[in-house]
Structure formats: structure tokens, C-alpha cells
Amino acid sequence: VSPVPIVALLLLGCAANAQSDARILHAIGQVEGGERGQRGDGGAALGLYQMHPEAWADGNAQLLREGREPFPRWQWRSPLAQDMVALAYLRALRGRLTARGIPNPSPECLALCWNLGFTGAASIGFRLSNAPAARASYAVRVGNLVRR
């Protein structure tokens, strides 16, 4: 698995948060299986980051809020579409966490939100200790990869 393409970072302005988010997404991609063309969860989760329709829609909504062009879900096989929508979804998650009083979430917290969905992560207080073992393990693996 290669890191998020340089093109996606250039489109995002190479801000420090964008670089941090790229590291987190790279880790998520590795933990999710590392294949751009993969389909999981009965075909509902697509691509390197295993994005469900709701996550893809949230990522596109974030792109629209930022004045950027969205990517229709049928473009999910495009590496650029996967990366741009996933990065936007991560920014949306960061915004929701900030609104909940968590302005600097750890990679593990973001991974919990990614894996459980924001509502699912909120229902356990965004805490690894409250997560089911497999979900907590997922978040820890993402965090470990980010810190490599």
C-alpha cells in the first residue's frame, strides 16, 4: 500500500493536518486490508478504506462545504476519488469531535469513529476501554501504524 497520492495532498494544500490525516488514512488502509479494489461487508464497504455509503456521502458533503467537487460513489475504484473522499470524511469526523469537545483526537479515537461510525463511537464515549475487543484492537493497530 502506498501513502495517499501526492496529488491529493497538493489539492488539499499540504497543511500539517492534511499530512497527519494522510498518515492516519494510510494506516487505516493497511488495517482494512490494503487493496484499492476490495469490497467488504457484503459489498457495502468499498475500496482501500472500506467506506460504507454513509461515510462516502459524509465525505462528499464535507467536500461540498469546502467548495470542492464531490465524487459520485460509482467512481469508488478511482484512487483519487477514494483518497479525496476519505480525507474529507476524516476532516468531517475531526469537526464533529471538536464540536463534542475533543479538538485534538488521537489516531485511535479517529479510528474508532471510522470503524464504528461517529454515532457508534459516541455511544461508547469515544473510549477504547468501552469498545468491543475487535474494534479496540483495530483502533490500536491504526494508532501503532501512525506512530511508526
Predicted ranges, named:
Residues V1-S2, I6-S20:
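Bacterial Sec-dependent signal peptides at the C-terminal "C-region" and cleavage site
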